[in-house]
A protein has these predicted regions:
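A short, N-terminal "cap"/entry segment at the start of jelly-roll beta-barrel domains
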Residues: 1-68, 149-170
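Conserved short histidine dyad/triad with adjacent acidic residue
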Residues: 52-62, 71-88
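Residues at beta-strand starts and edge strands
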Residues: 69-72, 132
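A short beta-strand-loop-beta hairpin characteristic of the jelly-roll/cupin
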Residues: 79, 83-116
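Short hydrophobic beta-strand segments that form the core of ligand-binding sensory/regulatory domains
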Residues: 92, 135-138
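Conserved metal-binding segment of the jelly-roll/cupin
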Residues: 111-132, 139-142
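Charged mid-protein connector segments
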Residues: 119, 125, 141-161
Length: 170
């Protein structure tokens, strides 16, 4: 029988938290409160296709764009055209605020209209098109991955589409 080798452990760099602190990083002082800022919906009244990051990174003291320490929210405007979106993120969520169109991503085409939600896994661009004015609210976790210094290696789930028509049935 071989005797185990004992190593002297050091806790100089360790931090200990009870559940209340771990569950509330703001209260424990690990992160600051996300500052309040209103973003005007006038962006959607303008012409052309564009993306507006709802960027608070300067106020948060982190690299941006970032709306919070771990997420970036964006407005996406489509004006009878096409807009490509891309993020180094584990997932992306698109909520359709108005209009109708379609998104090509992950080798599939997703027709959408107001009230629908599309969730995409890591791994590529999304191309949104609309023959009318349309608006999307886009959220992804690129700020968290940037902070951690990592990139997603593979998609961990299949794309998911939630029609607003289905929500009326439940």
């Amino acid at each position: 029988m071989v005797a185990p080798v004992l190593h002297q452990a050091s806790s100089e760099q360790a931090r200990f938290f009870d559940y209340r602190s771990a569950a509330n990083p703001q209260q424990s002082g690990l992160i600051n409160a996300v500052p309040y800022r209103s973003f005007s919906p006038d962006f959607f009244d303008q012409s052309g296709c564009d993306v507006l990051p709802l960027d608070l990174s300067e106020m948060l003291g982190c690299s941006g764009p970032a709306t919070g320490p771990s997420l970036c929210a964006n407005f996406v405007r489509l004006d009878r055209g096409e807009q490509r979106t891309s993020a180094v993120a584990t997932s992306q969520l698109f909520f359709i605020t108005n209009g109708e169109g379609e998104t090509q991503a992950c080798g599939q085409t997703f027709p959408w209209s107001k009230g629908d939600i599309l969730v995409l896994p890591a791994g590529g661009d999304a191309i949104h098109t609309s023959s009318v004015k349309a608006g999307l609210y886009w959220v992804h976790d690129a700020p968290l991955l940037r902070y951690l210094g990592v990139e997603p290696a593979q998609a961990r789930f299949e794309p998911s589409f939630y029609s607003h028509h289905d929500s009326r049935r439940h």
